[in-house]
Amino acid sequence: LVIDKLAAMNEVILEKQYFRQWWIIILFGGIDAIILYGLLTQLITGTPWGDKPLSDIGVIILYICFTLFALFFMNMGLQTRIDDHGIHFKFIPFSRRFTTYLWSEISKCEVREYSPVKEYGGWGIRYGRNGMAYNVSGNQGIDIILKNGKRVLIGTKKNIEIQLFLSKIESINKPI
């Protein structure tokens, strides 16, 4: 009966988050611009860049490697799907498939404010005193406690929408 009611909800929350904070863009853009300036200075004017300059090929390789790293970092992200089956998430590019926690496996689930630095040591895939965290930005997360005692926090920007969804799930699961 509970599963039928969940399926009848027919509601899905999708969320994609990427490392696109303004300060990250400025940091990577600034470093990339400095390396590009050095590259162009050295290649066009022939003036070695810096007091211990790299060869022309070395500066080209440095620029290409840093640019590829910045693009890789900027495209890392967290995808979350919440539906009538449970909570599904993956951290791109490190997870090919979604990790799924079915509602039947979850003993407690709530949206809460947290301190990424104090509780988990920052953003990304992190391990802290409260278990694993998968977060990209912000300080709002879905705190999941599984029936086996495992605890997972998934960062979110859709905290209000998810809280409303969780309230619906909770009301369906209450005995009549």
Question: What residue ranges belong to the model's regions?
Answer:
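Short aromatic/basic micro-patch
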Residues: 13, 81, 100, 153-156
